[in-house]
Amino acid sequence: MRRNGALLLMAVLAACGETPPPCSSPDNAGSAPSAGCLVWDARGALLVKDWSGEWALPGGSVNASESPRCGAEREVFEETGLIARAGDLAIVFDNGFHLYWCGVPASAEPRIHRPLEVADVTWWNLEALPDGTWRYPGQGAMIRELILARLEAPAD
């Protein structure tokens, strides 16, 4: 039992100490208190669940030395282990949270990268997005609306 506890502690500490990759576009343009990514591809929307049981998009606080775009990419890595590339700005919320459309490699699979913060990380298809268990009220409906609008938009 003691050996299993020591192995778990080593795994937690190793994941927390991993350095995020460099930002894909370190432009340092703009500022925001927080940012995140809406990663949507053939697998669905990438969501994280915290230990209270609530789902959310990967995201969090932006460091003083980084742009919102870089903060969004870093947060995806910290929470899911995936290397994301932030693209277009999807929306800025009233609280200043910047949400970007982000891509990850098609072969990459998410993993719980911060086990003290994240209880689960997975892909959800549009029809199966969980109802009523969101960190922020109305977030599930907002994600559906953003994805549907993007799918219906004419290609450039």
Predicted regions and their residues:
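A short gly/proline-enriched turn/hairpin at secondary-structure junctions
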Residues: 56-60
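Acidic, metal-coordinating catalytic segment for phosphate/diphosphate chemistry
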Residues: 17-35
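Unchanged
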Residues: 61-142, 146-153
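Entry beta-strands of beta-propeller and related beta-repeat scaffolds
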Residues: 44-45
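Bacterial N-terminal signal peptides
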Residues: 5-14
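Short loop/turn segments immediately following the C-termini of beta-strands
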Residues: 50
